């Protein structure tokens, strides 16, 4: 779900820069791959990757890709509405809501995604592979699965007060 209005300023964070080498007849060709997460700290976040022979160019390409890849994250106050588990490749991510003031208890790539999404209180655990791109993809997949109480009630055909 790409957002066309660039009126809001997006913050960007470089999660990983990888030097990739291709061995050819004439020697080694080196390139850089960048993984960047962007967000407005207000419920919108996205990630992108870029490759180039120069690091700044790879980062620029990744930021452009990330801006085209924004998703909306439903929030309840400063946390997420419910617990969610998601997988991508070998990476598994568990996200749990936390009480207000608890802060973001998350490592590296997960922290970048949830902070830029604007989630201030969350607990997370990364299991399996710790490859940054797969962790970021699993985290974003988990955030996509989140539903507000109103949405769940509507799907079940009951009122929000009957959900408990």
Swiss-Prot record:
Arranged from A to Z, the UniProt key words for this protein are: Ribonucleoprotein, Ribosomal protein, RNA-binding, rRNA-binding
Q: Which residues are in the S5 DRBM domain?
A: 10-73
Q: Which Pfam family is one of those matched by this entry?
A: Ribosomal_S5_C
- InterPro entries listed in its UniProt record: Ribosomal_Su5_D2-typ_SF, Ribosomal_uS5, Ribosomal_uS5_bac-type, Ribosomal_uS5_C, Ribosomal_uS5_N, Ribosomal_uS5_N_CS, Ribsml_uS5_D2-typ_fold_subgr
Say yes or no: keyword RNA-binding present.
Answer: yes
Query: Mind listing the GO biological process terms from this record?
Result: translation
Keyword Transmembrane listed: no
The molecular function terms of the Gene Ontology recorded here are: rRNA binding; structural constituent of ribosome
PANTHER family membership: MITOCHONDRIAL RIBOSOMAL PROTEIN S5
Q: Which HAMAP family match?
A: Ribosomal_uS5_B
- Notes concerning its domains: The N-terminal domain interacts with the head of the 30S subunit; the C-terminal domain interacts with the body and contacts protein S4. The interaction surface between S4 and S5 is involved in control of translational fidelity.
Q: How does it assemble?
A: Part of the 30S ribosomal subunit. Contacts proteins S4 and S8.
Give the protein's recorded name. Answer: Small ribosomal subunit protein uS5
Species of origin: Streptococcus thermophilus (strain ATCC BAA-250 / LMG 18311)
Gene from which the chain derives: rpsE
């Amino acid at each position: 779900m790409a957002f066309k209005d660039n009126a809001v300023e997006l913050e960007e964070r470089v999660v990983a820069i990888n030097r990739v080498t291709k061995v050819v007849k004439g020697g080694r060709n080196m390139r850089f791959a960048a993984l960047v997460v962007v967000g407005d700290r207000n419920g919108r976040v996205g990630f992108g990757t870029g490759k180039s022979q120069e690091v700044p160019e790879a980062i620029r390409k990744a930021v452009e890709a990330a801006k085209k890849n924004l998703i909306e994250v439903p929030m309840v106050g400063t946390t997420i509405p419910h617990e969610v588990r998601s997988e991508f490749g070998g990476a598994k991510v568990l996200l749990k809501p936390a009480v207000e003031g608890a802060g973001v208890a998350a490592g590296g790539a997960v922290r970048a995604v949830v902070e830029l999404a604007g989630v201030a209180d969350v607990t997370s655990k990364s299991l399996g592979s710790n490859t940054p791109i797969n962790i970021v993809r699993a985290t974003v997949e988990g955030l996509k699965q989140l539903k507000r109480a109103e949405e769940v009630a509507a799907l079940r055909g009951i009122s929000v007060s009957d959900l408990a």
